[in-house]
Amino acid sequence: MKLLKIGISGVRGIVGETIVPELVMDFASAFGTYLQAKKVLVGRDTRISGPMLHEAALSSLIATGCDVLDLGICPTPILQFMVRKLEAGGAISITAGHNDLKWNALTFIDQEGTYLNVFQGEEVLDIYHLGKFDKAAVDRLGKLEKTENYLDNYFACLKKYLNAEAIRKARLKVIIDPCSGAGAGVIDVFSRYLGFELIPVNNEPNGYFPHDPEPRPRNAQEVASVMKVIKADVGFLLNSDVSRISIVAENGEMLSEEFTFPLIASEYLKRKQGTVITNLSSSRMIEDVTRMRKCPLMKAKVGQSYSIQMALYEDAVLAGEGSGSVAVLEFQPAFDGFLTMGFILEIMASRKKKISELVAELPRYHIVKEKIYCPPTKVHSVVHEVKKLFIDRKMDSSDGIKVEDEDGWVHIRASATEPMIRIIAEGRSRENARERAEEVMNFILTLVK
């Protein structure tokens, strides 16, 4: 079965099967028609399918009458920042984030630099399904402009927002692995602006990912292996569009991506209190942190668009997910890996503490993340069947099924990006978390054989 995942903020699939130039042209035409000839920005990650899809999107937007500013290879958070900076009508980011090389996607961004909300997404999808796209006359075709100076715009603002002087004085040695994605090369500019010593790993923007581009401990072996040898202070892993990060401590410990958001929140909420948004699959660490800082916590469905839209609606100060995504709303309403890394460096510099010492201040839980392949036609019926396991338990059904008790929880949901059912379980011990996950996994396997 060919896989195409259509969501409120874009479309994702396997290149050559469902993600083909014709489909990209139709979706870009729908988005251009929705924007009504406003300026639109386009950027992409380094995937080898990127140039093909990029050109298809550019031509289709121009055909609808939109002026297009082409940023080329560009991390998604920088693209989002530039939408607001240039007062554009929106943007398309061509990236599949944490998915492997065979995948690619179009992500639609509105004039505020955020992913489309449900209502905006439905409008674009309606236009796409109707197939009635604006077709500009020859004298009204959009204009194409290319730019390469956007990095200085972004990093100058980031430097001003952070305490760059404290970071520079700390003389931090930092390893960053952008996985040959959109952050490759850009991390050099990042280091120059903030004044730390950069040791890059996989810093060639060639699109051939040397490992799975999901920032998780299992992909951190290369960074962890050299941490002690070169006496680095911290290491970071990035996904292909720099919207998510994970951390490697100076002692070589490959930290779960679940630590990223609580680490930021614990420090930020000392400075500015307010509502915090997370999702249903994130660790209880963030619950403990917000309780300690006396700040309200609200939970959205899993998906960056849902978290950001709830954050805007609730006037939240922070949003984040257990995937390593963090948004500081006063900087921009977007998950931003550069801001996340910079803020962690600022915490280390200002508090004069090692990353292992900062993480030790956080509560510790054990989390297990698994996924099981499930044909798209069966996903929702399988998730529904799982309810029978917990018929006598209180459950949250707002996004799949989540069952909690005093010692932990398990969350079962259909993936929005892959033909998978995700099972995430957390407990006070690794054994407890594993037991919760395996109970569900064994049941699901009987249904998908």
Q: Where is each model-derived feature located?
A:
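Gly/Ser/Thr-enriched, mixed-charge loops and adjacent short helices
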Residues: M1, I14, N104-I230
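An N-terminal, well-structured beta->alpha segment
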Residues: M1-G65, G89, K143-V174
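General beta-strand structural signal in soluble alpha/beta enzymes
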Residues: I6-G7, V42, V68-I73, S93-I94, ...
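N-terminal small/polar loop signature for handling phosphorylated ligands or for N-terminal nucleophile
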Residues: S29, K39-W103, V189-V248
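Gly/Ser/Thr-rich active-site loops/lids in small-molecule metabolic enzymes
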Residues: N117, P200-N202, E253-Q273, G337-S350
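Proline/glycine-rich low-complexity loops and linkers
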Residues: E122-A156, K160, A249-G322, V326-V328
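Phosphate-binding and adjacent anionic-ligand microenvironments
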Residues: V234, R271-K449
